[in-house]
A protein has these predicted regions:
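Intrinsically disordered, low-complexity regulatory segments that flank or precede the catalytic domain
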Residues: 1-52
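Glycine-rich ATP phosphate-binding loop
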Residues: 68-93
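C-terminal regulatory tails of eukaryotic serine/threonine kinases
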Residues: 215-250, 257, 374-429
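Activation segment signature within eukaryotic-like protein kinase domains
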Residues: 163-164
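A conserved loop-to-beta-strand element in the N-lobe of protein kinase catalytic cores
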Residues: 119, 128-136, 144-145
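A short, aromatic-enriched beta-strand patch in the conserved N-lobe beta-sheet
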Residues: 123-124
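Protein kinase glycine-rich loop
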Residues: 57-69
Length: 429
């Protein structure tokens, strides 16, 4: 999928710095164990300030618009090293491209996150040229690569329910914190060592000056556990089962409703195939765009492609003439035209349940005011029949459909781009 802001390669200077950090050692000192970084550098909300001398970059993991990510060894105060994902940004390039605000916003958002499905900022380091953010390393790669490994390059419905439900919980938390994600796509959903998701890449996210003040609304239910709002699921799977009375009256329990997030934007940002109609048309947008992207995300996991991918039609030319986008391809313009004017069409194959299709239709409503979740937030999405049987309070206790193999020691003395030592054809972030 084409991002609106094109990724750029690392400068030669940064490459030389990375290789300088590699040094002349014969191999990596990483022992293959995924020791939680917080044990060595602390889980402080602001992240610990480290020296560049504490870092050793050992492998390229990927690149984005404002920086590149490396697998890095972080020197432990007790001796030895631990592994982390290091996002390296060239401060001169950020200034030249007017991207300093995006880098600063991502840092502030990472500092604010405290949720099992979202990354924590473990630490940072910088000098006169480079700025580095250290977050948790996810050895399972991302959902885009994992989808490529599935039969027919798509997930079964049970797997989709698992991944979508965890994404809903993560975005619900962000909305409560006043954050609009704006960049949901399989490439940005990582798989942790336990098989659960972790959303990443927040440089396109938008944060309100103040967190949302969640309203409370009653929800009649006959099962207390089903109504728990899973903003930060942390209930142990090993507690003794509570004994509830066999007969109990229906009661009304409070639910968090954080929508809409108190911030609006007219920015044209995101990945083409995931853009909401209100972004394409330039009408201004709010948190409802995240629920649109959830619909596109769910469709892609089920069918293996996005619902509005550019095809030959007569709409895109008018749209292109009315919008000043010199760097947007005709294919992308057709995609944008489809987003604005074409309804979602479900293929005959594979067979997908009516509940899944109904949820996607609700999320892909063109009018953001009528979009599922736009006004009542995640609780109304959670109550959709597609999620029947999901215990939101114990969502972390569900067995994932895929658990990555234990991360093994790799000979990092090889070229930084040599992936031949990996057991699986996945990208690491």
């Amino acid at each position: 999928m084409t991002a609106l802001t094109a990724s750029e390669d690392l400068s030669d200077d940064l490459q030389s710095v990375i290789f300088d950090f590699l040094g002349s050692d014969s191999g990596s000192s990483f022992d293959g164990r995924t020791t939680p970084p917080e044990k060595a550098i602390g889980r402080q909300r602001s992240g610990e300030k480290l020296s560049m001398a504490d870092l050793r970059f050992v492998k390229s993991l990927g690149s984005g618009d404002i920086g590149s990510v490396y697998l890095a060894e972080v020197k432990r105060s007790s001796g030895g090293f631990l592994v982390a994902a290091a996002k390296v940004m060239d401060k001169r390039e950020l200034a030249a491209r007017d991207k300093e605000g995006r880098a600063r916003a991502e840092r502030e958002i990472l500092e604010d996150l405290d949720h099992p499905f979202l990354p924590r900022l473990y630490g940072s380091a910088e000098d006169g040229r480079w700025s580095v953010l250290l977050t948790e390393f996810c050895p399972g790669g991302d959902l885009h690569i994992l989808r490529q490994l599935q039969p027919l390059k798509r997930f079964d419905e049970a797997s989709v329910r698992f991944y979508v439900s965890e994404v809903v919980v993560a975005m619900e938390y962000m909305h409560v914190r006043g954050i609009i994600y704006r960049d949901l796509k399989p490439e940005n959903v990582l798989i942790g060592s336990d098989g659960h998701v972790m959303l990443t890449d927040f440089d396109l996210s938008l944060k309100s000056s103040s967190s949302s003040s969640p309203a409370f609304a009653g929800s009649p239910t006959s099962d207390i556990t089903s109504a728990v709002s899973c903003l930060a699921p942390a209930i142990s799977c090993f507690h003794r089962r509570l004994r509830w009375p066999r007969f109990r009256r229906r009661r009304t329990l409070p639910e968090f409703m954080s929508e809409p997030v108190n911030v609006r934007s007219n920015s044209f940002v995101g990945t083409h195939e995931y853009l909401a109609p209100e972004i394409v048309s330039g009408e201004g947008h709010g948190s409802a765009v995240d629920w649109w992207t959830l619909g596109v995300f769910m469709f892609e996991l089920l069918y293996g492609f996005t619902p509005f991918t550019g095809e030959s039609n007569h709409l895109w030319n008018n749209l292109k003439q009315s919008m000043k986008m010199r760097h947007v391809t005709d294919f992308d313009m057709m995609t944008l035209a489809n987003i604005v004017a074409r309804g979602v069409v479900f293929p005959k194959e594979p067979t997908v349940s009516d509940a899944a299709k109904d949820l996607i239709r609700g999320l892909l409503a063109k009018d953001p005011d009528r979009r599922l979740g736009a006004t009542l937030g995640a609780p109304v999405i959670k109550r959709h029949r597609f999620f029947d049987g999901v215990n939101w309070a114990l969502i972390r206790c569900v067995s994932p459909p895929h658990v990555p193999p234990a991360f093994k020691t790799v000979d990092f003395s090889k070229d930084v781009y040599d992936d031949s030592g990996l057991d699986m054809p996945v990208e690491f972030y």
